[in-house]
A protein has these predicted regions:
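Extracellular/periplasmic bilobal clamshell ligand-binding domains
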Residues: 95-131
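Ligand-binding pocket segment of bilobal, Venus flytrap-like solute-binding proteins
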Residues: 1-34
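A bilobed periplasmic-binding-protein/Venus flytrap-type ligand-binding module shared by bacterial periplasmic
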Residues: 47-60, 79-83
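Periplasmic-binding protein-like
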Residues: 70-94
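Solvent-exposed loop/turn segments at secondary-structure junctions
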Residues: 11-14, 38-41, 59, 73-74
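Substrate/cofactor-recognition hotspot
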Residues: 67
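Stable alpha-helical elements in mature extracytoplasmic
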Residues: 12, 60-64, 76, 122-125
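Short glycine/proline-rich, acidic loop/turn segments that cap or connect secondary-structure elements
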Residues: 39-44, 85-104
Length: 131
């Protein structure tokens, strides 16, 4: 379809820009990536998170912890940025040149638990309007 504005995760922007499909690389020329809610009194842009944890009764706790430590290590975080256009969660890791070229943004600091609390009502609204 056609539209004036769309909401996407930023990493799709990078995937389109560097796609092996020439049509997708052409599409990106008509797109502008913006981060909403960036004014002085605005809340900032929503950010997605990926969580990890170790199950209480895990038989391999040491291995699970080692995996989580690797995933947040500078080497792994660099790969996330270079391959999947994701921002690092490790503050010791700089964003890639591509991510930096998209500009700085203020992130929404709403606690994730609040989002979870509001999700059922949000779903009702989505269902009601047929989105």
């Amino acid at each position: 379809g056609e539209c004036d504005i769309a909401i996407i995760n930023n990493y799709y922007f990078g995937k389109l820009k560097y796609s092996e499909d020439p049509k997708q690389r052409e599409w990106i020329k008509n797109l502008l990536l913006i981060f909403p809610n960036q004014g002085i009194n605005d809340r900032g842009a929503h950010i997605n998170i990926s969580g990890g944890g170790v199950a209480k009764y895990s038989k391999n706790k040491e291995s699970a912890i080692a995996l989580l430590e690797f995933l947040t290590s500078p080497d792994a975080q660099k790969l996330y940025g270079e391959i999947n256009f994701e921002y690092p969660v490790n503050s010791r890791v700089s964003s890639t040149k591509e991510l930096i070229s998209w500009g700085e943004f203020k992130e929404d600091r709403l606690p994730i638990i609040k989002i979870a609390e509001l999700a059922p009502n949000a779903q009702k609204i989505i269902d009601r309007v047929g989105w």
